[in-house]
């Protein structure tokens, strides 16, 4: 497996406004990246996203600016199942709240190439 184990996600603290950076397992599906909060919505970084979905993240030396959102497994059953399966294959684990990270740079970069 050539893919890195972690990505680095930066959110803005909803109380402090300060940058909060974490190292977290991830998978990529199509153009988006997905991470899972083991403790659900109580994780500080998830709370930050709920208050302000603007994020930045880096993976494998590439930096992105984007938006994050919580995946609703009841309404997005196929997406949730596919992300869970990708996490199981990569990490042998898939339990928790799925969060989608969408790069706002992707389409612009593709047009330039």
Give the location of each predicted region:
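Short beta-strand segments
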Residues: 4-38, 55
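Short, structured beta-strand-loop surface elements
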Residues: 40-112
């Amino acid at each position: 497996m050539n893919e890195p184990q972690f990505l680095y996600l930066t959110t803005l603290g909803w109380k402090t406004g300060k940058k909060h950076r974490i190292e977290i397992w991830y998978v990529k599906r199509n153009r988006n990246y997905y991470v899972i909060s083991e403790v659900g919505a109580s994780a500080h970084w998830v709370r930050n996203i709920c208050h302000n979905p603007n994020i930045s993240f880096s993976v494998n030396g590439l930096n992105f600016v984007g938006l994050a959102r919580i995946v609703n497994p009841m309404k997005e059953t196929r997406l949730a199942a596919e992300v869970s399966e990708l996490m199981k294959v990569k990490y042998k684990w898939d339990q928790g709240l799925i969060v989608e990270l969408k790069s706002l740079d992707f389409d612009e970069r593709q047009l330039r190439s």
